[in-house]
Amino acid sequence: AGGGPAGVEALVAEARARFTYGHPERRFDDGCAAVPFLGCGVAEGSCVDINTYLVASLRAAGYEAAYLYGYFFPEEKVDSAVDGHCWVATRLDGDVLDWDVAHHIKAGLDPVRPALNPRPGRRALVSHSMGHRYATAEGEIALKLLGEPVWRAPGGAISDPDQRAIRAL
């Protein structure tokens, strides 16, 4: 694959070639201690499967890659998102590119190019794993994962936020 942008593009193309889009009863990595290499054949997978494979491939090759999770609100259903969605971001030489392989597969778009979901709509990002650094009075704090918010009610009860509340943030 070589290095640089061509290497990232080659690994994205490899992940695209290894999957068809779907929600299988058994995931390609069920029962595995590590993400397996898919050397031949094609596996059925959702955005979770495809992007788990892609992030593992990118990181194994030495690229900085993030697994992002959130909600996608299709233009035709702006008031709700039934499921979550995930995608990948890469950072190379200061440039951050988003890769939404699963939605490119669903839309029949090949080759996969750096872009978010090709369908019109809105995204609400709720977790990001590329790492963050924040300056504080005590020094720098590094966080590996920013995760999905939860509501904490008086008395300590924790619940998932309403999707409309997330969209309003």
Regions found by a protein language model. Give the residues of each.
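N-terminal accessory/pre-domain segments preceding catalytic cores
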Residues: 1-14, 96, 130-169
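Secondary-structure boundary elements
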Residues: 1-42, 165, 169
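Hydrophobic (often cysteine-bearing) scaffold residues that line and stabilize catalytic clefts
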Residues: 4-8, 46, 50-54
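Alpha-helical protein-protein interaction elements
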Residues: 11-13, 29, 91, 126, ...
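Alpha-helix capping and helix-loop boundary segments enriched in small/acidic/polar residues
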Residues: 42-45, 76
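Hydrophobic/aromatic-rich core segments of domains that either
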Residues: 49-140
